[in-house]
């Protein structure tokens, strides 16, 4: 949404109150090295869950928009993650509506349309100087994607719940195969991400013992879906304690050791509760600048213990109504809409991708000795080193 805020005259400042002339440059200087941008098929045809036409100011990212913003990101020397929504509006576990222009297609034709659309979009991005480095083939697709239209009867919708018919899952994986095929053909160096949000065992009833999460990636493996990275959403106010996210990561590391994990959506308020909050974490992390900073620091610390985790993205970090006529309703970005200042959490977030190491050293008898833990070359501590090169007692060691 950054171009919208720039056009509206939003005022951005550092945490110390110095003016920011270029937000992307500021993000990079602070330590961010990648940006994530969503893509809708035709946001002019967006509808509500009742099938009625609506205008959501925030649903505006068509291909031309993404080409322009993606090029800005690449020109800054940052990595670009493209988030295909494969819908005209928001896609998440509660709604995965088929684009209106594709509504009449049967399953085979829909799969072919998905392939051609994905391939063409990527070709246009490349031609515009905005080739993505990472590609999400769908957004929060825990329950499948392109179910049908919001006006369809519930029984007609092709949802993929754990209990859904096998035919629904087959249809879904056939769609994914066409999407990933297009990605490999057009952007062979890009990493493909499968993004879900079943990270909670306490707040998501179908995910006790992470059963829904496990079922999803089991289905992907059975269908031989081609991908590189497991993408997760984690919003503490919806998903519960940090330990729940860590439990999901532990399970994925055990069952899918060949896949990297990224938290592609994360956020926490600096002020009041986000609408629909189901988990109150405020005794530990109050809704304040300090509370937002503290939970971000603790999430980063936890993630850096896991060598299979290689990405952390804040959702909607640039939101800022300061100096505009826009609503200041959203209170979980990395800028305060009352002051325009960057929140303290931004600095903590950037520590995840910093080049500095968390390797500890101790002073014993006047002599410095490295600790006995193993670390990746980026400084992330690992519990049990597997194949690769690690730092141990201040030296590089190769594990075969």
PLM feature spans:
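Glycoside hydrolase catalytic-domain groove-lining segments
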Residues: 23-24, 170, 185-192, 199, ...
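Conserved, mostly hydrophobic/aromatic
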Residues: 27, 83, 135, 230, ...
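Aromatic-rich peripheral "rim/lid" segments of glycoside hydrolase catalytic domains that contact
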Residues: 11, 154-156, 247, 251-258, ...
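A general structural detector for well-ordered alpha-helical segments in enzyme core domains, enriched
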Residues: 19-26, 62-69, 117, 121-124, ...
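C-terminal outer-membrane/trafficking sorting elements
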Residues: 358-400
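Substrate-binding cleft and catalytic face of glycoside hydrolase catalytic domains
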Residues: 25-168, 173-193, 197-199
